[in-house]
Amino acid sequence: MGAGVIPFAVDEGEVQFLFQKTFSGRKVGYLIDFGGGLGEAEDYRATAVREFVEETETMYLADDLGVACRSEERVRRQIAHVEELFERTLSVHPHWWCRRDPGTPENPKDWRTYFIEFPFRDISALNNEWKSDTDGRFKKRRELVWIPAHKLLELYSRSPGDLWKRVRQLE
């Protein structure tokens, strides 16, 4: 069981979706959502919120990128902000989530992905922080990527292999 989020924002009248890329591990080369397994006593929504904060290493909503890190205190504070974004979106659009194709009946996947509006942010400074990290401040190097809605639709129809499996398996 797990959950994730694909944030979106409107920038200059264009809807864009936020994905991440990694540089090591089994997800290299894919566009990936922000998600993972349910934590102890977590529901889907709480998991998606926490995973976004952890996987962006608290940088996305940080005012000062120089102090962003994945400490318990910073994660806890950012979770409150991301919960507000979820509430703002889902209170108006409660069905802006979908399930992952469960796959085989013997081992069905139980996954929920939310589509939540976030404030648009230029991500180049965040990507530079990850790229220039030499002292291990961050857990894993990532790169954030904004994908315009029309390009995401093209990926689904023409190049679904560029999307991480749980993204391309959304129902």
Predicted segments with their positions:
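Acidic, metal-coordinating catalytic segment for phosphate/diphosphate chemistry
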Residues: 1-6, 10-12
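Short, hydrophobic/aromatic-rich beta-strand segments within well-structured domains
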Residues: 6-8, 18-20, 115
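N-terminal functional modules and adjacent low-complexity/disordered segments of proteins
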Residues: 14, 18, 80-81, 85, ...
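Nudix hydrolase/Nudix homology domain
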Residues: 25-30, 87-171
